[in-house]
Structures are given as C-alpha cells and as structure tokens.
Amino acid sequence: WPNKIEPGK
C-alpha cells in the first residue's frame, strides 16, 4: 500500500 516512508510501494 502507498505510505509516507516509501511512496509507490
């Protein structure tokens, strides 16, 4: 899912 640590994952 998209998150703030690794966007795009």
UniProtKB/Swiss-Prot annotation:
Quick one: a GO biological-process term for this protein? killing of cells of another organism
Tissue specificity of this protein: Expressed by the venom gland.
Could you name the Gene Ontology cellular component terms for this entry?
A: extracellular region
Q: Where in the cell is it found?
A: Secreted
Record key words, sorted: Cytolysis, Secreted
Function, please? Presents weak hemolytic activity at physiological concentrations (micromolar range). Does not induce mast cell degranulation, weak lactate dehydrogenase (LDH) release from mast cells and antimicrobial effects. In vivo, injection into mice induces increase in nociceptive sensibility, but causes very reduced or no edema formation. It also causes no alteration in rearing (standing on hind limbs) and does not impact locomotion.
According to UniProt, the name of this protein is Cryptide Pep-6
Native source species: Tityus obscurus (Amazonian scorpion)
Q: What is the lineage of its organism?
A: Eukaryota, Metazoa, Ecdysozoa, Arthropoda, Chelicerata
